[in-house]
């Protein structure tokens, strides 16, 4: 929902004609780079038109220029029924954007020597094993599933865990490894990017096992609180209902989200802008170094360079580093992105690494 306008937002920020990618609005202003006043006026008019045209109940966004929060604003309603307005501080279901924070938490553990990116997942989750038609030695298949491959969607695991017909999906990360053991690989690990929610769920289980803390607690203590992301949580009920947006699917019905905390990040555009600014500052937030510079660089380094079947799709640790099916920015400006669509919600985060610009749009 509303994804078509996210990349043109960055075109506007750059002062290019990228704003023209937002039909049917009037011509965009020819603003100088760094002069955001006219661009913001233009976007405010166009966003309202597009929300009405696409029947979007509520939306919030943030625009970042390096360490500056250029603009953050909410439009429409967080709760249409009770006429509660959306703001830049409203928490939306961020869905797959959680993977950016999970990758960051994994890199933190690697920095402390608590795990290695190239170590097999099975070293941490010893009860977990896979089945493979690609390996004569099944233990070789288990050893091929590393944290690096999990974080870059190259583990070979299927996208989701489909329980047996009369089975139950695990309702906690502690149960997950045993419940999904014996899953068949979809392709050989390290040969192809294939998006896997299951892979990240297992990384979340490994974070719990490695730290001895509940996943939500570890993420709060090591990322959310240090970044002052006060409107963010991996535990939905930790945020008051008044701070959260209602999700609406077709027909205006409320949407629902995942039951596992790794997929249940709630956050606001302003909070996510703090995460982005930390990355732009090479892992530093105010006086605290949350990630080392080399970890941030590793996050943005292509991990799938040798995969012929990935063509021009470049993937870092969590981040998609090239379009991978999305539209290019005008002029071929390089951008990194992550997008999410869950029942009733949409979120999109785009970075321009050379220009140190970012746009966060949540609806």
What is the predicted role of each segment?
Residues 346-352, 356-363:
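Short, well-ordered beta-strand elements
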Residues 1-8:
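Bacterial N-terminal signal peptides that target proteins for export
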Residues 41-47, 61, 67, 93-121, ...:
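Active-site SXXK
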Residues 17-18:
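C-terminal motif of bacterial Sec signal peptides marking the signal peptidase cleavage site
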Residues 117-135, 226-227:
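Short, glycine/proline-biased beta-turn/loop segments that scaffold the active-site neighborhood
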Residues 33-92, 114-116, 130-131, 181-183, ...:
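Short, conserved catalytic-motif segment at the N-terminal edge
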Residues 75-79, 132-343, 347-348:
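Short, surface-exposed loop or secondary-structure junction motifs
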Residues 92-95, 193-195:
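Catalytic tyrosine of NAD(P)H-dependent dehydrogenase/reductases that use a Tyr as the general acid/base
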């Amino acid at each position: 929902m509303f994804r078509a306008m996210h990349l043109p937002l960055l075109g506007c920020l750059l002062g290019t004609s990228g704003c023209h990618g937002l039909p049917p609005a009037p011509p965009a202003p020819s603003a100088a780079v760094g002069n955001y006043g006219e661009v913001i006026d233009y976007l405010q008019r166009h966003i309202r038109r597009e929300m009405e045209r696409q029947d979007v109940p509520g939306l919030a966004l943030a625009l970042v220029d390096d360490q500056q929060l250029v603009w953050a604003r909410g439009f429409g309603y967080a709760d249409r029924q009770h006429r509660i307005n959306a703001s830049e501080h409203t928490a939306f279901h961020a869905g797959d954007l959680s993977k950016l924070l999970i990758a960051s938490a994994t890199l933190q553990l690697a920095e402390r020597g608590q795990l290695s990116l190239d170590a097999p997942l099975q070293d941490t989750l010893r009860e977990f094993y896979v089945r493979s038609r690609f390996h004569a030695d099944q233990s070789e298949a288990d050893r091929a599933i590393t944290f690096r491959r999990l974080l870059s969607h190259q583990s070979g695991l299927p996208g989701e865990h489909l329980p047996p017909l009369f089975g139950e999906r695990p309702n906690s990360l502690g149960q997950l490894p045993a419940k999904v053991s014996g899953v068949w690989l979809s392709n050989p690990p390290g040969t192809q990017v294939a998006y896997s929610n299951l892979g990240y769920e297992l990384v979340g289980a490994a974070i719990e096992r490695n730290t001895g803390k509940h996943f939500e607690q570890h993420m709060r203590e090591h990322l959310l609180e240090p970044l002052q992301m006060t409107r963010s949580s991996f535990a939905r009920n930790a945020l008051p209902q008044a701070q959260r947006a209602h999700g609406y699917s077709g027909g205006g019905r409320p949407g629902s989200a995942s039951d596992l905390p790794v997929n249940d990040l709630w956050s606001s555009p302003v909070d996510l802008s703090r995460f982005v600014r930390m990355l732009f500052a090479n892992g530093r937030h105010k006086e605290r170094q949350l990630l080392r510079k080399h970890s941030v660089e590793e996050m943005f380094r292509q991990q799938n360079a040798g995969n012929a079947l990935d063509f021009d799709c470049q993937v870092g640790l969590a981040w998609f580093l090239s379009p991978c099916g999305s539209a290019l920015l005008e002029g071929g400006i390089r951008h990194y992105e992550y997008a999410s669509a869950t029942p009733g919600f949409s979120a999109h985060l785009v970075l321009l690494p050379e220009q140190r610009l970012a746009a966060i749009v949540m609806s």
